[in-house]
Amino acid sequence: MTITALTLGMILSAYLAGSISSAVLVCRLRGLPDPRTQGSGNPGATNVLRIGGVSSAALVLFFDMLKGALPAYIAFRLGLDSVSLGIIAIAACLGHIFPIFFHFKGGKGVATAFGAMAPIGPELALLLMGSWVLMVLICRYSSLAAIVTALLAPFYTWYLDDRFVLPVAMLSALIIIRHKENIQRLLKGEESKFSRKKTPKT
């Protein structure tokens, strides 16, 4: 790995892009409660689903994934090495987790991390999405689904395109570290299960 002005610029740009909190902005635009103070307190798509419904959560998920996908794809097209790609992707996730524009209080970084992995190929994107959805259907724990999918991601990548195993493993490690408290709650049986906002009957 060679640190160049281009690499440093991409790292900074990725962090700043990641710092744009899609959850907070979507909730403000739609007149919803602040996701940092409602539900689980996590400004991410899953919590927005709880407090705002499917369409709001879908918007948050799309933009959170885009924050990871764009920097990773641009860095790849610029010919940066795999370690640099991993660091740039992590910078986008760290922006989401510690956003400079929102008092450094952000989310878990799952969607942004998976978004950064997605440009590797549609097969990987489908495997990641399928693994997460399957785990949610089986256990109803969004956090456990994210952890299991993160653990599987390097193996999927090794099978599909082993050039990117290292950056994917770096992102997977970050996801698992960010879920330390969730793991503790899962072990104690105290973790909240996946749910969405119920539409009032008329």
From Swiss-Prot:
Classification via InterPro entries: G3P_acylTferase_PlsY (IPR003811)
Gene Ontology molecular functions: acyl-phosphate glycerol-3-phosphate acyltransferase activity
GO process terms (BP): phospholipid biosynthetic process
Segments crossing the lipid bilayer: 6-26, 56-76, 82-102, 118-138, 141-161
Primary localization class, coarse: membrane
Keyword list, A-Z: Cell inner membrane, Cell membrane, Lipid biosynthesis, Lipid metabolism, Membrane, Phospholipid biosynthesis, Phospholipid metabolism, Transferase, Transmembrane, Transmembrane helix
Pathway: Lipid metabolism; phospholipid metabolism
UniProt superkingdom: Bacteria
UniProt-listed Pfam families: G3P_acyltransf
Membrane topology: Multi-pass membrane protein
Enzyme Commission number(s) from the entry: 2.3.1.275
Keyword Cell inner membrane: yes
Reactions catalysed, as given in the entry: an acyl phosphate + sn-glycerol 3-phosphate = a 1-acyl-sn-glycero-3-phosphate + phosphate
Location of this chain's protein in the cell: Cell inner membrane
Cellular compartments per GO CC: plasma membrane
Family per similarity comment: Belongs to the PlsY family.
Its job: Catalyzes the transfer of an acyl group from acyl-phosphate (acyl-PO(4)) to glycerol-3-phosphate (G3P) to form lysophosphatidic acid (LPA). This enzyme utilizes acyl-phosphate as fatty acyl donor, but not acyl-CoA or acyl-ACP.
Description of how the protein assembles with itself and partners: Probably interacts with PlsX.
Record-linked NCBIfam families: glycerol-3-phosphate 1-O-acyltransferase PlsY
Name recorded for this polypeptide: Glycerol-3-phosphate acyltransferase
Organism listed in the record: Shewanella woodyi (strain ATCC 51908 / MS32)
Upper classification of the organism: Bacteria, Pseudomonadati, Pseudomonadota, Gammaproteobacteria, Alteromonadales
